[in-house]
Swiss-Prot record:
It catalyses: a ubiquinone + NADH + 5 H(+)(in) = a ubiquinol + NAD(+) + 4 H(+)(out). It is an enzyme of class 7 (translocase). The chain crosses the membrane at residues 4-24, 43-63, 84-104, 114-134, 140-160, 171-191, 213-233, 241-261, 272-292, 301-320, 325-347, 366-386, 413-433, 457-477, 485-505, 582-602. The gene is MT-ND5. This is NADH-ubiquinone oxidoreductase chain 5. It is found in: Mitochondrion inner membrane. InterPro entries: NADH_DH_su5_C, NADHpl_OxRdtase_5_subgr, ND/Mrp_TM, NU5C-like, Proton_antipo_N. Pfam families: NADH5_C, Proton_antipo_M, Proton_antipo_N.
Amino acid sequence: MNLFSSLTLVTLILLTMPIAAINFNTHKFTNYPLYVKTTISCAFITSMIPTMMFIHTGQEMIISNWHWLTIQTLKLSLSFKMDFFSMMFVPVALFVTWSIMEFSMWYMHSDPNINQFFKYLLLFLITMLILVTANNLFQLFIGWEGVGIMSFLLIGWWYGRTDANTAALQAILYNRIGDIGFILAMAWFLINLNTWDLQQIFMLNPNDSNLPLMGLILAATGKSAQFGLHPWLPSAMEGPTPVSALLHSSTMVVAGIFLLIRFYPLTENNKFGQSIMLCLGAMTTLFTAMCALTQNDIKKIIAFSTSSQLGLMMVTIGINQPHLAFLHICTHAFFKAMLFMCSGSIIHSLNDEQDIRKMGGLFKAMPFTTTALIIGSLALTGMPFLTGFYSKDLIIESANTSYTNAWALLMTLVATSFTAIYSTRIIFFALLGQPRFPTLININENNPFLINSIKRLLIGSLFAGFIISNNIPPMTIPQMTMPHYLKMTALTVTILGFILALEISNTTHYLKFNYPSNTFKFSNLLGYYPTIMHRLTPYMNLTMSQKSASSLLDLIWLETILPKTISLAQMKMSTTITSQKGLIKLYFLSFLITILISTTLLNFHE
């Protein structure tokens, strides 16, 4: 077991070496990206040893090696939790990052700041592994904020573009709302349980855990782009494609789901929390799948697809299957990162063209990318015996056979059929038909960095699901029994989606509409959500503020403060100084009496 803990720490320490190396050398590294990529591949191979040991022995471990600080009875120490979740996720994250780093060497080769880009990606990976292996909430929060800030820096990588800056700001603001929930949960655990260690929280297992659970769900909603806080994920596609492939498909966006999986001992007996997660996940998966149907930007379609899969993971936790949600996280990382890399390959070859309407006929020009894209799409739709099938099919079966909300189940099934539609749409528009791009474009996909990186993820998309599902404890699981039609539901829904996709594409080809339908507008404009939240709400707030400010200015400054105050002050002053009281009748009467007396006296004197 000493070897187990040592090798795990070696994996984490290996990754910090390139960060330290670039600080020691004042001259510029010319081959720094290659150095980083090699380090990550070594870390991946090293991480496989403790993972294999864990699979073989099935023993969890907590490494606590540095006491941090003590606040009265709260003890904080640097501790790593090596359990099923972290031991399976670390190799997957390292493998995917290794491939994406190699892909970046091709994609970003002309960028003058490529060394800084690789340093950012490496820092992101380190913070992600801190998040995954953390044993207390404080350490988890460091990783949580770390991936957030690296996401901000990487989305805004091309800082000369307004869209990139806006998207980066949007990501950080939406995540900030989620962080409020996380801090609320941390405060609650500190006040009520006086601990931040995960196993102590689970042992104490508070009964009234609704408030911290709501905080954790809010945190997951922000980080994993669930409905309500979802617009930042499609906007994040303004960053470079390697960033989208690494952060916004396979690692960072699943951090919110991972947090809820970590806290499954609290959620498994909390029906209220489960219902919220189920409904939130079902709404997310349907809404984002619907938005993906009519997008024309290839990266936006894959981004909405990611958001839809995150909704599916949330549904899985909602039906009390956290381990299954985790399996889907691991399998999803392979083919989704590969889909982004294929889209990056196409975009790069077509001179940064992202509109699928301006592609077409690429199956002959880019055979390798085409193969990978089609296999990735099939894995995403849950094609039998590809990677996605092993988790997605199980999720649909579990949802079908569980005692759950029928509406949520129906929404999930419809969203699953939509997956087939938008996957077919990408293939149909980008790869088939006649070329719709300028003939002068020089298409070349024969770079070893590109081929090798996609090839590795392609093999992962074919076999990773089988390998992971056969090697994760528990090895012996009770076989689910169900009718044939129920077993075939997932496949039937997917096939129906394919047929529907072909019908829709034929309709749009041969039946041209003068005006787009309302449904199309709703889907294409993302359910009007960004328009309402980013335009209408601030506009109303600003106009109301302006009106209230101007009316208050008119009322208070221009009327009450100046004219009325001056007149009031003068009245006060005059009444204070003068002895006159304004009794006109009395004055006239006294005047009259005086005149009468004086005239009488005058007459009498004469």
